Swiss-Prot record:
Function summary: Catalyzes the reversible interconversion of serine and glycine with tetrahydrofolate (THF) serving as the one-carbon carrier. This reaction serves as the major source of one-carbon groups required for the biosynthesis of purines, thymidylate, methionine, and other important biomolecules.
Catalytic class of the enzyme: transferase
Binding residues annotated for (6S)-5,6,7,8-tetrahydrofolate, in chain numbering: 121, 125-127, 246, 354-356
Protein name: Probable serine hydroxymethyltransferase
Protein encoded by which gene: glyA
GO biological process: glycine biosynthetic process from serine; tetrahydrofolate interconversion
GO cellular component terms attached to this protein's record: cytosol
Keywords: Cytoplasm, One-carbon metabolism, Pyridoxal phosphate, Transferase
Length: 420
């Protein structure tokens, strides 16, 4: 069999059908998972290119393999574009994921047993910020700060108190489910009081930072990590930034050979494409619309009587607290899924429900904003979500509401076609 003469449909009908059906699914639902987005055909083209064939251990100009001239150019482009996008002196585009980026920081700056202070998982933090289920909570002495019990906002006084008490080596500012802006300057002030490194994990808000819609952590944090998907609208991957080039040298060594072997050159090329797209004026307009849409979505749900955590949003995330409604996050997310609206169940701060059940749902606006949704469309989406939630409050069988909403979703989604 000559593999170069066969297309996917001919050689592997199973995978071909899976991809086809997933494409249909993405085209036919209202995608509200806050960590998801739709990349451009240009990003897809780079990611699916012959660069996937090339092994390139090491860094540009210092590879362990020959034949790296072209991939060196690709990586250099990605680095220079990332530095320009975030206005920083150092960028590493090799992390395979945001988690790998965070692990590289741990390896570069900490020793096993050192203390790390990060946001608790139930308050909106990430697994890699010290969760006991994660390496960060197993290898290091993890201490967590939370949010205020009344406002659900970060309590910076508590962060400072815990920092003074525990003297962390690393303080983390970042989240996976928090709808408000972060004060990186305040975090740095706290870090300096105890001699800690400050790491800003901007995986969710990188696009907002790049577009100038959120305070940049670059002037404040010693090190910044991110994913390249989500609001950056690039391929799934990681990114590390800094203005401290000495720390950058430590990060380089930690990532390779410390954590990873060969970088994924096709992904790095796709990152370069996404960074170029993010440097265009249209991208700033896109991010502004993402935030406007999130506020419209939150307001629409509030109008229908649903509790929005913190009373609203400053970014792309809307967290719906369902505790007073007697609905679990799992039941709500599953019912919405059947109605053509995709989101995820999410813990609410101080939630006593199992993380597999939860008391809330997390909604996000980046993906549908990419499709072209505007404020009025998200107002409608909010009402459709409320129709499903209302049905769940009144009956265990929500099929009637699901069918009605699915019909409305189908009409709406046809107005915004994207991948052919």
């Amino acid at each position: 069999m000559n593999i170069f003469n066969n297309k996917l449909q001919e050689i592997d009908k199973g995978i071909f059908e899976i991809i086809k059906h997933e494409k249909t699914r993405q085209n036919s639902v209202i995608e509200l998972i806050a960590s998801e987005n739709f990349v451009s055909p240009a990003v897809l083209e780079a990611q699916g290119s012959v660069l996937t064939n090339k092994y390139a251990e090491g860094y540009s100009g210092k590879r362990f393999y020959n034949g790296c001239e072209e991939v060196d150019k690709a990586e250099n482009l990605a680095i220079e574009r990332a530095k320009k996008l975030f206005n920083c002196k150092y960028a590493n585009v090799q992390p395979h994921s945001g988690s790998q980026a965070n692990q590289a920081v741990y390896l570069a700056l900490m020793q096993p047993g050192d203390t790390v202070l990060g946001m608790s998982l139930d308050s909106g933090g990430h697994l890699t910020h010290g969760s006991t289920a994660n390496m960060s909570g197993k290898w290091f002495n993890a201490v967590s700060y939370s949010v205020d019990k009344e406002t659900y906002l970060i309590d910076y006084d508590e962060v400072e108190r815990l920092a003074i008490l525990h003297k962390p080596k690393l303080l983390i500012a970042g989240f996976s489910a928090y709808p408000r802006n972060l004060d990186f300057a305040k975090f740095r002030e706290i870090a300096d009081k105890v001699g800690a490194y400050l790491m800003a994990d901007i995986a969710h808000i990188a696009g907002l930072v790049a577009a100038g819609e959120h305070q940049s952590p670059i002037p404040h944090a010693h090190i910044v990590t991110s994913t390249t998907n989500k609001t950056l609208r690039g391929p799934r991957g990681g990114l590390i930034l800094s203005n401290d080039e000495e720390i950058g040298k430590k990060i380089n060594s930690a990532l390779f050979p410390g954590l990873q072997g060969g970088p994924l050159m096709h992904i790095i090329a796709a990152k370069a494409v996404a960074f170029l797209e993010s440097l265009q004026p249209e991208y700033k307009s896109y991010i502004k619309q993402v935030i406007i849409n999130a506020k419209a979505l939150a307001g629409s749900l509030q109008e229908r009587g649903y509790d929005i955590l913190t009373g609203g949003t400053d970014n792309h995330i809307v967290l719906v607290d369902l505790r007073k409604d007697g609905i679990t996050g799992k039941i709500a997310a599953n019912s919405l899924d059947r109605a053509g609206i995709t989101c995820n169940k999410n813990a609410i701060p101080f939630d006593k429900t199992s993380p597999f059940i939860t008391s809330g749902i997390r909604l996000g606006t980046p993906a549908c904003t990419t499709r072209g949704f505007k404020e009025k469309d998200f107002v409608l989406v909010g009402h459709l979500i409320a129709d499903i939630l209302d049905g769940l409050k009144n009956s265990e069988d929500n099929s009637k509401a699901e069918q009605k909403v699915l019909s409305e979703v189908t009409k709406l989604i046809k107005l915004f076609p994207f991948y052919d």
